[in-house]
Amino acid sequence: MSKLKSSESVRVVVRCRPMNGKEKAASYDKVVDVDVKLGQVSVKNPKGTSHEMPKTFTFDAVYDWNAKQFELYDETFRPLVDSVLQGFNGTIFAYGQTGTGKTYTMEGVRGDPEKRGVIPNSFDHIFTHISRSQNQQYLVRASYLEIYQEEIRDLLSKDQTKRLELKERPDTGVYVKDLSSFVTKSVKEIEHVMNVGNQNRSVGATNMNEHSSRSHAIFVITIECSEVGLDGENHIRVGKLNLVDLAGSERQAKTGAQGERLKEATKINLSLSALGNVISALVDGKSTHIPYRDSKLTRLLQDSLGGNAKTVMVANVGPASYNVEETLTTLRYANRAKNIKNKPRVNEDPKDALLREFQEEIARLKAQLEKRSIGRRKRREKRREGGGSGGGGEEEEEEGEEGEEDGDDKDDYWREQQEKLEIEKRAIVEDHSLVAEEKMRLLKEKEKKMEDLRREKDAAEMLGAKIKAMESKLLVGGKNIVDHTNEQQKILEQKRQEIAEQKRREREIQQQMESRDEETLELKETYTSLQQEVDIKTKKLKKLFSKLQAVKAEIHDLQEEHIKERQELEQTQNELTRELKLKHLIIENFIPLEEKNKIMNRSFFDDEEDHWKLHPITRLENQQMMKRPVSAVGYKRPLSQHARMSMMIRPEPRYRAENIMLLELDMPSRTTRDYEGPAISPKVQAALDAALQDEDEIQVDASSFESTASRKPKARPKSGRKSGSSSSSSGNPASQFYPQSRGLVPK
């Protein structure tokens, strides 16, 4: 019995979404039937015959498209979150094809209380439980990460390019190094943390989903609870809730993924395939090795699958005939996951509990503050003893001050001390019997006392503020809630849990009754005639034959699925082989053999991070490179101070490490002359000279033009300038009286 109690099966529920607009427009058939009472999902074969039996799967609970978000949470997830508040580890993850509503199940619709998913409902549940608790201190932390293309990113970090590493310790198991976590004190704060992470998450559009998650996201809530035990000491319980939103498996032919989307889909499918292999290996009793290290996702879910955690798996499916193959694959994996056994235990008094560190730091600061107040009391007692019996009034005043301070009225104490010093300063200033030097000395002493008092007050206030800030991060219940309302809410939640538990028991009883009906019928049946017996036996035979056919069809489908997976793996292997050959070809032709051997000798495979690394060039990893000596600054080799001084004073080369021969430069005589160009261009100068020359008067006889005016003008010659000039010189006698054209530009 103890063995049965220590182990617990993974709880698997199935949720079917409604038909979307695209599926209705394409006139796809609905092939998924959901029986909520029996917890069964039946899938029809759209290509099969009418006599073919549908494939039926039974789960812990099933929800159809009419199920509300709060029903799903109250019946399935609330008991798990209660276990986390008691100190267990818990995991909720949504599994299924892309576009089936995994993100809707986990996150829901922001701003709509009725459509809030598992994550926002768990926030309300956790902080409501804390507010109703008594004599308990809580510390709630939140972290958010994603696995994008097998790289872990911190969604709450400012530097989104930083990649985180997975580490493992014997006491805590697998954890993410340098993952940031934020202490949250209310639902509003933890929702803000989730919203910041969602803005950094990788999301893209495909043909099957407009807002497709391109990464696996894990929201981690760590709840630490401190409570005084029967032994009178504080005991700390730490519960961790992992809320996992997986990216959906997808086929490139349906999603139309290309380029970066295709790379993302390949990595998503590989990690989900590794998750399926882990589930199969855990269920199969013959497997001696569980392949957790095949992907980052399976390593992070190592405790949730077969480890120290309570796990609920939500399998999301679509009802359309278009996705029947993916629906069957999801249901088969979910059916296998039912048989995984976990061994959850309460995490009591862990060494790395942050709550204990907070409590120790608060106690240290309070002790420091108390020490300061004790010092002030001792100083007052000394002053009182020094005052003697004559200072009875002052003694009574100081006793009153001490009583006020003990009554936590510290502000009045500081104010009275300051007023007292001010009165003493005024008395010194008004005392004319004192010498000026003595008066200045006394005033300086009072100023110093006032400064010390102010400094002590600031230090005490700073310590008090630090204590308040740390105490504000620790949540204590039962302060701001009306007891009557609190009790009513508790009763209401208990009734809800009882109803959910009753539904679960009814479902289990009905499943057991159906399985035993056949056995009881065989035992109780009596036949009045041989014909009746033949008819009943024939009916049973037909029923068994249909079951046999269903099992054969299931085996055939599994074989086909196995063949497809093998073909996909072979294709992946061929692509990797081709890429490897290309790398080898580049190395052989472009990288020298010595460099290749150096890198090969330094390379090693890191099992922790699951990839190849290079050993450091130096033997010791932390050893730093030798620095240049300080005496060698500005020189090629170290020099002593004496050598430097000798170099500056004497010209001899004894102490010189460089520039031993100091030679002056031998400057050669100049053999060239600077070019001096003309002030004006030669062509321009010639034109100006020609234009400025004196010319004789020209007489023109225009009588010849009168005789030639009546003649026809000759056609213009085609040859241009030369022919024109020759014809004018030969045919026109008047042209000899005209001079040739002149100008700045020669023609």
From Swiss-Prot:
UniProt xrefs under PROSITE patterns: KINESIN_MOTOR_1, KINESIN_MOTOR_2
Pfam families the record matches: Kinesin
GO cellular component: axon; centrosome; cilium; cytosol; dendrite; dendrite cytoplasm; dendritic spine; glutamatergic synapse
Record field: compositional bias (Low complexity): 722-735
Residue numbers bearing the N-acetylmethionine modification: M1
Observed phenotype of the null mutant: Deficient mice do not survive beyond midgestation, exhibiting growth retardation, pericardial sac ballooning, and neural tube disorganization. Kif3b +/- mice exhibit schizophrenia-like phenotypes, both behaviorally and histologically. Hippocampal neurons have altered spine morphology and synapse function, and at the cellular level, they display abnormal growth cone morphology.
Compositional bias annotation for Basic residues: 711-721
Single Gene Ontology MF annotation: microtubule motor activity
Signal peptide: none
Binding annotation for ATP: G96, Q97, T98, G99, T100, G101, K102, T103
Compartments where found: Cytoplasm, Cytoskeleton; Cell projection, Cilium; Cell projection, Dendritic spine
Coiled-coil blocks: 346-579
Residue positions, PTM N-acetylserine: S2
Keywords in alphabetical order: Acetylation, ATP-binding, Cell projection, Coiled coil, Cytoplasm, Cytoskeleton, Microtubule, Motor protein, Nucleotide-binding, Synapse
Domain annotation Kinesin motor: ranges: 9-340
Main location: cytoplasm
Gene3D superfamilies reported for this sequence: Kinesin motor domain (3.40.850.10)
GO biological process, one term: vesicle-mediated transport
Residues covered by region (Globular): 580-747
Location of region: Disordered: 374-412, 698-747
Job of this protein: Microtubule-based molecular motor that transport intracellular cargos, such as vesicles, organelles and protein complexes. Uses ATP hydrolysis to generate force to bind and move along the microtubule. Plays a role in cilia formation. Involved in photoreceptor integrity and opsin trafficking in rod photoreceptors. Transports vesicles containing N-methyl-D-aspartate (NMDA) receptor subunit GRIN2A into neuronal dendrites.
SUBUNIT field: Heterodimer of KIF3A and KIF3B. KIF3A/KIF3B heterodimer interacts with KIFAP3 forming a heterotrimeric (KIF3A/KIF3B/KIFAP3) complex. Interacts with the SMC3 subunit of the cohesin complex. Interacts directly with IFT20. Interacts with FLCN.
Protein name, entry field: Kinesin-like protein KIF3B
Source organism: Mus musculus
